[in-house]
Amino acid sequence: MMGSMAFRFLLWLVGLGAWVGPASGPNPLRLVEEDLAQRCDRVRHCGPGELAQRLLQLEPVALFDTRSAQEFEISHIPGAIRVDPSIPAGEFRRSFGDLAAGRDVVFYCSVGVRSTALAQRLQNAACVIGAKSVCNLSGGLFRWHNEERALVSHGRSAKTVHPFDDYWARFLKPAA
């Protein structure tokens, strides 16, 4: 089953790459966001502004970064916890149940592909442990960075984001 899912994911990425084409115009990342929202309409997508507001108001949010350890080391959103995007639902409940209970759970990755898949897969598990809601950060860390929001690495302010690869790097604004 996982092989089949990985193959479908690869086909989706190839199709998206052909559809989006070169990064040009005012906001090519928006096309990726819109495509994800349409393909995964069972997952709620929240924008960086909404998440930033919740974090500023100290609302209880369980924030999970679904990128690789290497990507997370370079920078992440303050307060985020790295979680493997292939984590089984039972392991997620055991490892993060206390943290997620009574909170809104937000997943993010570079642009939203991995985090949307995980949010969709873990929605039921999160509800079972008492999470208030589950959402994907629309545009992921790339949009967060492009809007010049706070990033950290090892407890210090960070300015750069791991580009994932050359294809996805074109969706990042250069660090100021």
Language model segments and positions:
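Short hydrophobic beta-strand that contains or immediately precedes a catalytic carboxylate
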Residues: L51, A62-R67
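Gly/Ser/Thr-rich loops at beta-strand to alpha-helix junctions
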Residues: S110-T116
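Rhodanese-like catalytic fold shared by cysteine-dependent sulfurtransferases
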Residues: S4-G49, E73-D104, T116-A176
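Active-site-proximal beta-strand/loop segments in catalytic clefts of secreted hydrolases
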Residues: T66-R67, P85-S86, Y108-S110
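Alpha-helix capping/helix-boundary segments
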Residues: S68-A69, R114
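Structural motif
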Residues: A62, D104-V106
